[in-house]
């Protein structure tokens, strides 16, 4: 019986371009959605631009345009990128829409009327020069725990500590460069703890991946806190009903944007919105997200929906981050690659296939290794799958007037491909795309072996074996057709070319057991060319050039204006720091820590354990064996996860933009930096 399914991907922020890291999620989701449609299910895929918040307001001011103009331009760029990567949204909307405003107000008011909203006075950092309250990320200063310089207003990327902006030492506003002052303001809070019993049942009820459900247990143990859902003017967003100069925090109306985009689709296509969103709906609702935004989607979002009388998600599927060549995406190395830069040089279906080949149902990070990328594309897609058609089509085109034989010469092989259908469908359904790709390539190997054994290029020289050649090539092309059916969720554009070659209608999953016989095909045209190293290298260089252009456009004093040089110290003060070269012997994730990696450092005979807030920037395995610089005489600090016996040095604003110091060749562990 056909299922009714609504699927969403996380909303990209309308303040910058789509890059390859974003595309992991959209490609993963699109493959799953296309598979559901091929199976005959009623499946809708919606998304939108996340178009509210302080960063958008400030960027619009800097560019001298309205926020609406900025987000419209960004939306056009995003949609063009998605279309060229064959992401098949049924609706791509914006959180700055009439539908989203209505739904946000409805959800807020229903929760308020049930007593789930409260207000209280909070003390916040305020920029007197800019005349606005400052989000935590717009405040920088010295960590109150470890004294690391240039840290955000809410957490330290070095030691992992969290704190309030008022605790930050020597704090400054990144907007004006002046110290913020404290000012009181009334804020609105969502009482998340009201929903704790519901959320415990739901998060442990099979709606999340096991590792994600386990992670949520830590938050339950710590106690669910009220969630601040308001921001003060000036702010780009929706005003809170019956309030003055108060706006919904972007994270309140962003997930509601899923429903707004679907409502936009329903109004356009005459669909019944309520039949998908009422508590007892039989429709299915799935959210694909990055593992870093689980807290909002698995706690706040279900609670808000339940409080407003809507149904809860059927499941939330989280995925890991993208690394490139074993390291975080880097602008300096040219591996921070925008979607548009990729499209300028390479076939988008190369990336769709590579991601599919490496994606599973878990939350492990995915590494894009360009040597492996080129090898897999050329060996699997061109060398195996497409090769079957190119080996057989020429004989049919040239010797048989484009006509396929009227029978299958070896039905058992065809049926073997048919028999793989349900197992492959199970892999697709479970998001185990990597398993599916391996099994499909194993089938392609069998098809190529069959052609090798039959040698139609030899048989065609014997006039008495002409019919044999037609039958062998007919079977080969039917096996190729079956493979294209199985690969259609991953390679929709190549499959469309194959459908034109076969002179057939759009292929569905059920077509796999029906051979194409006594049928006229079209002349074969190359369906895909090999990936070339020179084009990959050109893409990387082009990404570096974009960085250079952007760098030249920024005033040379921009960083210093944002982060002024600290007060002058005497040499004696600097000499108190014992900086040493250290080699990273081990690097591993810390269970229960969102930002920390545990490093084991060699100081030439002495080993130190250091916890570093670099998890978002580096895959642990990419750090092993590298040299770095550490503060060796920093007093040991007891943390929840163990004793940290020093500090490694890094530059950058934090998060994924962290750059470990890397000594030049010749430096050895234990050497002092002076």
UniProtKB/Swiss-Prot annotation:
Locus of motif 'KMSKS' region: 328-332
Keywords linked to the UniProt accession: Aminoacyl-tRNA synthetase, ATP-binding, Cytoplasm, Ligase, Metal-binding, Nucleotide-binding, Protein biosynthesis, RNA-binding, tRNA-binding, Zinc
EC number(s) on file: 6.1.1.10
Protein name listed in UniProt: Methionine--tRNA ligase
GO cellular component, one term: cytosol
Lineage: Bacteria, Pseudomonadati, Pseudomonadota, Gammaproteobacteria, Chromatiales
Location in the cell: Cytoplasm
Disulfide bonds: none
Catalytic activity: tRNA(Met) + L-methionine + ATP = L-methionyl-tRNA(Met) + AMP + diphosphate
């Amino acid at each position: 019986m056909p299922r009714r399914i609504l699927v969403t991907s996380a909303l990209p922020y309308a303040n910058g371009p789509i890059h390859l890291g974003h595309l992991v999620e959209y490609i993963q989701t699109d493959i799953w959605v296309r598979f559901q449609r091929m199976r005959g299910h009623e499946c809708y895929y919606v998304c939108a631009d996340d178009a509210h918040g302080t960063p958008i307001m400030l960027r619009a001011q800097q560019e001298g345009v309205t926020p609406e103009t900025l987000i419209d331009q960004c939306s056009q760029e995003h949609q063009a990128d998605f279309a060229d990567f064959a992401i098949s949204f049924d609706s791509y909307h914006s959180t700055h829409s009439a539908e989203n405003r209505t739904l946000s107000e409805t959800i807020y008011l229903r929760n308020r009327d049930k007593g789930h909203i409260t207000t209280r006075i909070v003390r916040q950092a305020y920029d007197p020069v800019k005349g606005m309250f400052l989000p935590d990320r717009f405040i920088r200063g010295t960590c109150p725990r470890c004294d690391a310089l240039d840290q955000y207003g809410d957490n330290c990327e070095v030691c992992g500590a969290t704190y309030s902006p008022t605790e930050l030492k020597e704090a400054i506003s990144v907007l004006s460069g002046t110290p913020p002052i404290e000012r009181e303001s009334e804020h609105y809070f969502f009482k998340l703890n009201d929903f704790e019993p519901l959320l415990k049942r739901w998060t442990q009820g099979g709606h999340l991946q096991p590792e994600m459900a386990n992670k949520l247990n830590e938050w339950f143990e710590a106690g669910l806190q009220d969630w601040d859902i308001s921001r003060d003017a000036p702010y780009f967003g929706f005003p809170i009903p019956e309030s003055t100069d108060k706006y919904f925090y972007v994270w309140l109306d962003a997930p509601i944007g899923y429903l707004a985009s679907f409502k936009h689709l329903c109004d356009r296509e005459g669909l019944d919105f309520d039949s998908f969103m009422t508590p007892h709906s039989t429709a299915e609702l799935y959210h694909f997200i990055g593992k870093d935004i689980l807290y909002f989607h698995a706690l706040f979002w279900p609670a808000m929906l339940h409080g407003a009388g809507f149904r809860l998600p059927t499941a939330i599927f989280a995925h890991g981050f993208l690394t490139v060549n074993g390291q975080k995406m880097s602008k300096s190395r040219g591996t921070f690659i925008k979607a548009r830069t990729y499209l300028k040089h390479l076939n988008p279906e190369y990336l769709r296939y590579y991601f599919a080949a490496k994606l599973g149902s878990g939350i492990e990070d995915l590494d894009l290794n360009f040597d492996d990328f080129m090898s897999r594309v050329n060996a699997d897609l061109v060398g195996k799958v497409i090769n079957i058609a190119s080996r057989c089509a020429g004989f049919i085109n040239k010797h048989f007037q484009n006509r396929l034989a009227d029978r299958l010469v070896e039905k058992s092989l065809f049926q073997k491909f048919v028999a793989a259908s349900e197992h492959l469908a199970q892999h697709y359904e479970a998001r185990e795309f990597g398993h599916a790709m391996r099994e499909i390539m194993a089938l392609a190997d069998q098809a190529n072996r069959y052609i090798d054994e039959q040698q139609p290029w030899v048989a065609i020289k014997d006039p008495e074996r002409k019919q044999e050649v037609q039958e062998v090539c007919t079977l080969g092309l039917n096996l190729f057709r079956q493979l294209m059916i199985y690969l259609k969720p991953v390679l929709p554009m190549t499959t469309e070319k194959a459908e034109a070659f076969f002179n057939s209608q759009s292929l569905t999953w059920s077509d796999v057991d029906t051979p194409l016989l006594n049928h006229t095909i079209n002349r074969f045209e190359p369906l895909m060319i090999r990936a070339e190293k020179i084009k990959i290298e050109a893409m990387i260089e082009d990404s570096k050039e974009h960085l250079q252009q952007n760098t030249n456009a920024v005033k040379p004093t921009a960083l210093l204006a944002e982060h002024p040089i600290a007060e002058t110290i005497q040499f004696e003060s600097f000499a108190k720091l014992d900086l040493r070269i250290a080699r990273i012997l081990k690097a591993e994730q810390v269970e229960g820590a969102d930002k920390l990696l545990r490093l084991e450092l060699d100081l030439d005979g002495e080993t130190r354990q250091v916890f570093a807030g670099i998890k978002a920037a580096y895959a642990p395995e990419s750090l092993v064996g590298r040299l770095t610089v550490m503060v060796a005489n920093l007093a040991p600090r007891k943390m929840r996860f163990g004793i940290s016996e020093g500090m490694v040095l890094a530059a950058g604003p934090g998060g994924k933009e962290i750059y470990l110091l890397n000594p030049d060749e010749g430096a050895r562990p234990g050497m002092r930096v002076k």
